[in-house]
UniProtKB/Swiss-Prot annotation:
Post-translational events: Proteolytically cleaved by proteinase PRTN3 into antibacterial peptide LL-37. Proteolytically cleaved by cathepsin CTSG and neutrophil elastase ELANE. After secretion onto the skin surface, the CAMP gene product is processed by a serine protease-dependent mechanism into multiple novel antimicrobial peptides distinct from and shorter than cathelicidin LL-37. These peptides show enhanced antimicrobial action, acquiring the ability to kill skin pathogens such as S.aureus, E.coli and C.albicans. These peptides have lost the ability to stimulate CXCL8/IL8 release from keratinocytes. The peptides act synergistically, killing bacteria at lower concentrations when present together, and maintain activity at increased salt condition.
Localization terms from the record: Secreted; Vesicle
Protein name, as recorded: Cathelicidin antimicrobial peptide
Name of the encoding gene: CAMP
Residues of the signal peptide: 1-30
Role played: Antimicrobial protein that is an integral component of the innate immune system. Binds to bacterial lipopolysaccharides (LPS). Acts via neutrophil N-formyl peptide receptors to enhance the release of CXCL2. Postsecretory processing generates multiple cathelicidin antimicrobial peptides with various lengths which act as a topical antimicrobial defense in sweat on skin. The unprocessed precursor form, cathelicidin antimicrobial peptide, inhibits the growth of Gram-negative E.coli and E.aerogenes with efficiencies comparable to that of the mature peptide LL-37 (in vitro).
GO BP terms, alphabetized: antimicrobial humoral immune response mediated by antimicrobial peptide; defense response to Gram-negative bacterium; defense response to Gram-positive bacterium; innate immune response; neutrophil activation
UniProt GO molecular function: lipopolysaccharide binding
Active core, as annotated region: 150-162
Lineage, top ranks: Eukaryota, Metazoa, Chordata, Craniata, Vertebrata
Length: 170
């Protein structure tokens, strides 16, 4: 009498299961997002949660910090988004939308997880006040240059007037 153990099909199934076991970890590794892909997914989430009328698109991504290799560990991110011309209700990808002229710019910081299966992020965005700070720096420099120039002009006038000697009639 023949048993199932002696059957050649059992050996084939064992081989198939072994191969599947070897291939599955490779499939899991393939589900790791790149740093930029994780940020773009986070922006999609920001757009879904936003109450603003238009979509936001990545304007500037800060350099990737050094990271460990674990895709399940939250990775720090910081980037800037800008308002686009596309309404939030559109089916377009934000990457296909033009930036809105004088659109709102937001600075975003937080963490993302690169494991695509977990698809997790914790990001907060605020109005980008850096351009106003730069504008303030510009006016301060202008004031310093004008103030310094006025001091020089004032000193030259004072020197000129000091060099004028009253003429005496002889």
């Amino acid at each position: 009498m023949k048993t199932q153990r002696d059957s050649p099909s059992l050996g084939r199934w064992s081989l198939v299961l072994l191969l599947l076991g070897l291939v599955m970890p490779l499939a899991i590794v393939a589900q790791v997002l790149s740093y930029q892909e994780a940020v773009l997914r986070a922006i999609d989430g920001i757009n879904q949660r936003s109450s603003d009328a238009n979509l936001y698109r990545l304007l500037d991504l800060d350099p990737r910090p050094t990271m460990d290799g674990d895709p399940d560990t939250p990775k720090p991110v910081s980037f800037t988004v800008k308002e686009t011309v596309c309404p939030r209700t559109t089916q377009k990808s934000p990457e296909d939308c033009d930036f809105k002229e004088d659109g709102l710019v937001k600075r975003c910081v937080g963490t993302v997880i690169l494991n695509q299966a977990r698809d997790s992020f914790d990001i907060s965005c605020d109005k980008d006040n850096r351009r106003f700070a730069r504008l303030g720096n510009f006016f301060r420099k202008v004031k310093e240059k004008i103030g310094g120039g006025l001091k020089k002009v004032g000193q030259k006038i004072k020197d000129f007037l000091g060099n004028l000697v009253p003429r005496t009639a002889s």
